[in-house]
């Protein structure tokens, strides 16, 4: 007997019986959607996990600057580069090509000054964030594997510079689950599609429940978040019928990760309809909060909006929130003119500082790890002496961490005199990831998923926790 009855052949009696059966599931469905059934919690892939060790942080807010921020113009003062500007230097790689190249040193374009009690030097590009430097650990010895945007962006997000793999946010969701069953565990605030596209928040072979949910600043940050049904009661009736059909389908198919992920997505979506509008409703924020972030009341876009919404998501238990400031255009990729860094820095500087101060005032910075990074740096040299821009540079660049078990007011690692290569205490992207996982109580060597006959992990077969920067 064919049990697949199409809508066009379903009789009135069959339809009524299905609706009645669906309505009988409403009490159990409502309990499931609200997370009240312990058995369902055990099946829920987003249930809170148990860390391997003692976590210093319970959540992450990652600020990603797309395009490649120049380290020698922002976080890594190179006085000798300034003194020797215009002189030639021989390098072994340029624009991805190996060989011996004679290049002209290019001076930093902004002045560096000692900041805070710690005296860490930061350039004038980030005056407000620099005022928070006593809470920052600036890493000046970051290193990536690739000089192209696509591969470097993929590597910073997934640990793989060649093939699509689960993103860091997905790994953290898999390891720790969510603290709020009405919200996704991993949310990305992205006004544009970045280099490498949606792979930067994809879950790849991990269950689909762990992929990032993209929020696009605007009047409808999450598509279809508003209920289309006439009432909540009618929606519950629809969900009851759908749950019954899915459960029957699951029983016939056995284990099916895609089906489980789809079923979980309906539960999460129902919860999001209740809680997401509240996250985006900023009417309960004070005027002083709006001023500190540089956000106009009523605005629903811009990096300031992203930062304030990120704080509200973190407050509500979202494990991993990523903010991408731009996308694959109009970003920090300053080939033609380094002065394009100025408006981009002005766009992110005040809200970044406000986010750090806001988290600190609310007592959240202690267990919130804030990560600021980019895919690579920019060359301290150029092929032409009068070139106004800088090229891609993956041999060394800068990132910083704050809160969540990190020692503030310090720098770690160093580039050489000209900012060309790592001179001390290299922190590869794999080490960066291992350290972030460690701060969350996750052992990067044990957080694995078996796929195609081998165990995969975020750090592949590499990675060292940088214990020296931990508080």
What are these regions (language model features)?
Residues 1-471:
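Ligand-binding pockets and gating/stacking loops
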């Amino acid at each position: 007997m064919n049990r697949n009855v199409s809508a066009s052949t379903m009789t009135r009696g069959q339809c009524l019986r299905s609706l009645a059966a669906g309505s009988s599931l409403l009490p159990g469905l409502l309990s499931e959607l609200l997370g009240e059934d312990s058995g369902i919690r055990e099946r829920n892939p987003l249930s809170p996990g148990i860390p391997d060790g003692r976590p210093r942080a319970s959540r992450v807010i990652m600020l990603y600057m797309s395009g490649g921020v120049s380290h020698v113009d922002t976080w890594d003062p190179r006085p000798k580069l300034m003194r020797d500007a215009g002189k030639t230097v021989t390098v072994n790689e340029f624009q991805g090509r190996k060989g011996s190249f004679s290049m002209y040193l290019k001076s930093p374009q902004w002045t560096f000054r000692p900041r805070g009690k710690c005296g860490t030097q930061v350039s004038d590009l980030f005056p407000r964030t620099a005022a928070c430097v006593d809470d920052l650990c600036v890493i000046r010895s970051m290193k990536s594997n690739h000089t192209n945007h696509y591969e470097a962006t993929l590597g910073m997000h997934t640990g793989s510079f060649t093939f699509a793999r689960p993103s860091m946010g997905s790994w953290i969701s898999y390891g720790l689950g969510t603290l709020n069953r009405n919200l996704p565990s991993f949310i990305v605030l992205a006004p544009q599609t970045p280099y490498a596209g949606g792979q930067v928040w994809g879950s790849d072979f991990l269950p689909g429940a762990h992929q990032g949910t993209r929020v696009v600043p605007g009047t409808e940050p999450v598509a279809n978040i508003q209920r289309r049904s006439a009432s909540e009661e009618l929606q519950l009736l629809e969900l009851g019928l759908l749950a019954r059909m899915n459960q029957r389908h699951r029983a016939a198919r056995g284990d099916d990760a895609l089906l489980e992920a789809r079923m979980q997505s309906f539960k999460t979506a129902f919860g999001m309809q209740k809680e997401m509008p509240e996250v985006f409703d900023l009417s309960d924020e004070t005027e002083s909060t709006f001023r500190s972030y540089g956000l106009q009341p009523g605005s629903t876009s811009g990096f300031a909006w992203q930062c304030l919404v990120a704080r509200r998501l973190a407050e509500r238990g979202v494990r991993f929130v990523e903010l991408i400031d731009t996308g694959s255009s109009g970003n920090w990729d300053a080939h033609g003119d380094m002065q394009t860094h100025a408006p981009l820095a002005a766009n992110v500087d005040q809200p970044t500082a406000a986010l750090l101060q806001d988290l600190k005032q609310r007592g959240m910075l202690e267990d919130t790890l804030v990560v600021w990074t980019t895919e690579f740096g920019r060359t301290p040299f150029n092929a032409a002496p009068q070139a106004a821009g800088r090229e891609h540079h993956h041999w060394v660049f800068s990132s910083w961490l704050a809160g969540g078990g990190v020692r503030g007011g310090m720098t770690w690692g160093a580039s050489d005199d000209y900012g060309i290569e790592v001179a001390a205490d290299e922190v590869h992207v794999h080490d960066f990831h291992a350290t972030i996982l460690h701060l969350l109580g996750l052992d990067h060597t044990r957080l694995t998923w078996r796929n195609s006959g081998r165990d995969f992990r975020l750090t592949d077969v590499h990675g060292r926790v940088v214990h020296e920067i931990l508080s």
